[in-house]
Protein backbone atom coordinates (compact mmCIF):
# COMPACT_ATOMS: atom_id res chain seq x y z
CA UNK A 1 0.00 0.00 0.00
CA UNK A 2 1.32 3.43 -0.85
CA UNK A 3 1.81 6.03 1.86
CA UNK A 4 -0.90 8.15 0.22
CA UNK A 5 -3.44 5.33 0.47
CA UNK A 6 -2.48 4.57 4.08
CA UNK A 7 -2.72 8.25 4.91
CA UNK A 8 -6.17 8.44 3.34
CA UNK A 9 -7.31 5.27 5.10
CA UNK A 10 -6.24 6.50 8.55
CA UNK A 11 -8.02 9.81 7.94
CA UNK A 12 -11.16 7.93 6.84
CA UNK A 13 -11.12 5.80 9.99
CA UNK A 14 -10.46 8.82 12.21
CA UNK A 15 -13.46 10.57 10.67
CA UNK A 16 -15.61 7.44 10.97
CA UNK A 17 -14.76 7.03 14.66
CA UNK A 18 -14.64 10.80 15.29
CA UNK A 19 -11.18 10.74 16.85
CA UNK A 20 -8.48 13.39 16.66
CA UNK A 21 -4.87 12.73 15.69
CA UNK A 22 -3.81 13.50 19.24
CA UNK A 23 -6.31 11.08 20.76
CA UNK A 24 -5.44 8.34 18.26
CA UNK A 25 -1.72 8.74 18.95
CA UNK A 26 -2.33 8.44 22.68
CA UNK A 27 -4.65 5.46 22.26
CA UNK A 28 -2.14 3.74 19.96
CA UNK A 29 0.72 4.66 22.32
CA UNK A 30 2.78 6.20 19.53
CA UNK A 31 4.25 9.70 19.31
CA UNK A 32 1.92 12.30 17.83
CA UNK A 33 4.67 13.27 15.38
CA UNK A 34 4.84 9.69 14.08
CA UNK A 35 1.11 9.60 13.38
CA UNK A 36 1.18 13.07 11.82
CA UNK A 37 4.01 12.04 9.48
CA UNK A 38 2.18 8.86 8.45
CA UNK A 39 -1.02 10.81 7.75
CA UNK A 40 0.90 13.43 5.79
CA UNK A 41 2.54 10.72 3.69
CA UNK A 42 6.06 11.49 4.96
CA UNK A 43 6.56 8.00 6.39
CA UNK A 44 6.15 5.63 3.45
CA UNK A 45 6.83 2.42 5.36
CA UNK A 46 5.75 2.55 9.00
CA UNK A 47 6.81 -0.44 11.06
CA UNK A 48 4.47 -3.39 11.49
CA UNK A 49 4.38 -2.62 15.22
CA UNK A 50 3.14 0.90 14.48
CA UNK A 51 0.49 -0.41 12.07
CA UNK A 52 -0.68 -2.94 14.66
CA UNK A 53 -0.90 -0.25 17.34
CA UNK A 54 -2.95 2.03 15.08
CA UNK A 55 -5.23 -0.83 14.00
CA UNK A 56 -5.73 -1.90 17.62
CA UNK A 57 -6.58 1.68 18.60
CA UNK A 58 -9.36 1.63 16.00
CA UNK A 59 -10.43 -1.88 16.99
CA UNK A 60 -9.78 -3.22 13.49
CA UNK A 61 -7.29 -5.63 11.99
CA UNK A 62 -4.24 -4.52 10.05
CA UNK A 63 -5.88 -5.79 6.84
CA UNK A 64 -8.81 -3.44 7.38
CA UNK A 65 -6.46 -0.58 8.28
CA UNK A 66 -4.67 -1.17 4.99
CA UNK A 67 -7.99 -1.29 3.11
CA UNK A 68 -7.77 -4.96 2.25
CA UNK A 69 -11.21 -5.85 3.62
Describe these PLM feature segments.
Residues 11, 36-37, 66:
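Key DNA-contacting residues within the recognition helix of helix-turn-helix
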Residues 1-16:
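A short, Lys/Arg-rich alpha-helix, primarily the initiator
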Residues 41, 68:
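Conserved short acidic donor-positioning loop in nucleotide-sugar-dependent glycosyltransferases
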Residues 49-64:
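DNA major-groove recognition helix of helix-turn-helix/homeodomain DNA-binding modules
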Residues 15, 26, 56:
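Alpha-helical residues within the helix-turn-helix
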Residues 19-37:
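Short alpha-helical DNA-recognition segment
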Residues 11, 15, 29, 40:
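Residue-level detection of the helix-turn-helix DNA-binding "recognition helix"
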